Each structure stands twice: as C-alpha cells, then as structure tokens.
Amino acid sequence: ATPAPLDRRPLKPGKLTWKQLSLTRGENLLLKPHDLTLPQGQLGLLSGANGVGKSTLLQALCTLIPYQGKLSYAGQRPPHFFKQRWAKTVGLMLQEATAQFSCATVQEELALVSRNTLAPHYWTKERLAHAKQVLGLDELEPRSIYQLSGGQQQKLQFLSVLAMGQPVLLLDEPFANLDQASIQTCLTLLKDSCQAEQTAVLLISHQRVGITEHLDYELIFEDQTLKLGGNEN
C-alpha cells in the first residue's frame, strides 16, 4: 500500500529555485516542466517509485547532469558561477559512500572537512568532535576507510557532507545501511545544523519509519511531475 503523505508545515522562503525545470533520460521524459523553491531551514522528503527519477533530480540540482529550464540560487544561475562555486552552494550525498571519500583514513577525511567547512562558526572542532563521538567514529579514526563496515562508511560520509556546511543539502538514501538508533542520531545532527544554519535539505529515503516525524514536508515524484504531499498543519 502507498504510505500516507506526511502533513507539512508551512513552507519557508528559500534561495534555490527552479523554473520550468524538466528532465529526460535518453528519449524518456522523467519530469514535465516544474517550478519550485526549496525552503530554507526545513527538511523535505523526496518520495516516489524506484526509477521515477529521484536521484536524477538531485544530480540535476547539482548541475552534474543536463537539465532543461532555469536553476538559480539567490537569483544567480549556474552558468554565472564557476563550477566550484556552485559546489559550495549545493552539497550532495551519493548513494555509494566510497565514491565520495578523498582520504585513506577516517581521521584524515574528517580533518579535511574541518579545514574546508563553509560553516566554521557552526562546525567548530568541538562540535565536530561531539558528532564523531555520538556516531561512534572517534574510535575508528586510525582505521582505513575501506576497512569499515557499510554502516560505518555511511556515517562517515553523512558527517563529512553535513559538516561541509553548504546552504543546500541533498541526501540520496542517507540512512540505507543504518540501524534505527543511528538514524535518530543522524537526524538530530541534521535538524540541529539545518535550523542553526537555515539549510535547505531534501532527502530521499525508502524507509519512512522513524524519519517522517522529523521532516517538514514531502515532495512526491510521480506521473512525471512533483507535488507537495499531505495537508498543511
């Protein structure tokens, strides 16, 4: 049975906007022209059947794949940015954790994030140390990333992406390999930073249990369109 869409809170204004955005895969139309602004300081769920184009949409918002229509952040479109500058605006957590690591060990990866975070006033060394501790990563710091379990790699990837501090954060199945306790820990870190930094967060998760109650709205991808789910409360 199709799960009931979560009731949404009133949407806040935002800076990442798309107008008449459409997507194709080969000759197949995935998304008909669509307009939306992602609200800042709120967490959204992007839901839909397998293969409908959810991951494709996130990649398009990062300008990693072609799209049709207009995409902008605070009125500036990606062609006006250096590609590196757009990457400092929109962060993406991929489904495959190992595709996203730059270093050999846990300690080196997190040190790289600490040096390069775009939100150093929030992601202080003390806050990053706390996040490492609650995720159980502190005791793994000397370890090779490639000796970690799938769940440990995903927690490291999650913290690395989160602590980079981009104002827009897109998460593709961030909790797929985690138990419920770890999911709740990640959600607490995500909510705290989202509210403090007024981050616009959109995540894909096939698992809804223990997740939807933390989210502010749901964006449903079906029939080649996107629509807000549920009733406003």
Task: Annotate each language-model stretch with its function.
Residues 47-49:
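The feature captures the beta-strand-to-loop junction immediately N-terminal to the Walker
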Residues 158:
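Hydrophobic anchor residue at the start of the ABC signature
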Residues 62:
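Helix-to-loop junction immediately C-terminal to a conserved catalytic motif
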Residues 169-173:
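Catalytic Walker B motif of ABC-type/P-loop ATPase nucleotide-binding domains
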Residues 66-79, 86:
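Conserved ABC transporter NBD signature motif
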Residues 144-148:
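Conserved ABC ATPase signature
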Residues 122-140:
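Conserved ABC ATPase "signature" region
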